[in-house]
Amino acid sequence: MGQCRSANAEDAQEFSDVERAIETLIKNFHQYSVEGGKETLTPSELRDLVTQQLPHLMPSNCGLEEKIANLGSCNDSKLEFRSFWELIGEAAKSVKLERPVRGH
C-alpha cells in the first residue's frame, strides 16, 4: 500500500468523517502505547484502551477480551497496530445501525 500523508491541523478540515475516525484510532493507539515502543501495546495498555475507549463494545465482543487473554499478562507480549486494527474491525461487526445512513 502507498504512503499516507501526515495529518496536521490545516488538513483536518479536509478530512472526511471516515478519515477523522481513522486518525482518531491511530492517535488513541499511540496515546496508550507508552510502556514499550509507540508501535505496540502491552496487554495492560490494550486492556486500558479497550475499557476506556470502547466501554460499550467490550462487553458484547468476546474477540477483544479473547485477544487480550491470548497476549497473556506478561508485558513482554506486544500487540502491533495491524492486530489492533483487526480488533477494531471485530468490534465494528457488533455495531448495528438503527437505520441505514444514506447520502454519504
From Swiss-Prot:
Subcellular location: Cytoplasm
UniProt xrefs under InterPro entries: EF-hand-dom_pair (IPR011992), S100_Ca-bd_sub (IPR013787)
Domain EF-hand: 27-61
GO terms of molecular function: calcium ion binding; calcium-dependent protein binding; chemokine receptor binding
Key words, A-Z: Apoptosis, Cytoplasm
Known role: Modulates P53/TP53 protein levels, and thereby plays a role in the regulation of cell survival and apoptosis. Depending on the context, it can promote cell proliferation or apoptosis. Plays a role in the regulation of cell migration by modulating the levels of MMP2, a matrix protease that is under transcriptional control of P53/TP53. Does not bind calcium.
Protein known as: Protein S100-A14
GO biological process, one term: response to lipopolysaccharide
CDD domains for this protein: S-100A13
Principal location listed in the UniProt entry: cytoplasm
Tissue expression notes: Expressed at highest levels in colon and at moderate levels in thymus, kidney, liver, small intestine, and lung. Low expression in heart and no expression is seen in brain, skeletal muscle, spleen, placenta and peripheral blood leukocytes.
Self-association state and partner proteins as the record states: Homodimer. Interacts with AGER.
Cross-referenced Gene3D superfamilies: EF-hand
GO annotation, cellular component aspect: extracellular exosome; extracellular space; perinuclear region of cytoplasm
